[in-house]
Amino acid sequence: GRIYPAIHGAEKLTIFQPREENVIAGGSVLIQGAGWVDQDVPLRIEIINRAGDVLGSGQVELDAPAVGQLGTFSVEITYQTSQQQWARIGVYELHDEVPGLVHYTSVGVWLGP
């Protein structure tokens, strides 16, 4: 697959917590961020290790006054791992009419059991 840079400015989603390279343990992680979306659908979240295995996933609604306006999100996602490993937490928006990801942001973290 190819990645195409945004042609309409900066990415519309960002993750405030956790930060890049944070160490997380206990089987769940609080993910907080902000952004604006193109349609009224939940954001998707996936925690993926280096092998491409999904360790945890979920959805969260963006709390915004209206579609296209700045809002925030906060969600606790559970994950499963038996050893400490590097993983990427991705938050993204899918669109009904456009195949694939419309907006995507991620952070790399160290996950422990």
Where are the language model's segments positioned?
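Ser/Thr-rich low-complexity repeats and stalk/linker segments
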Residues: 1-3, 10-113
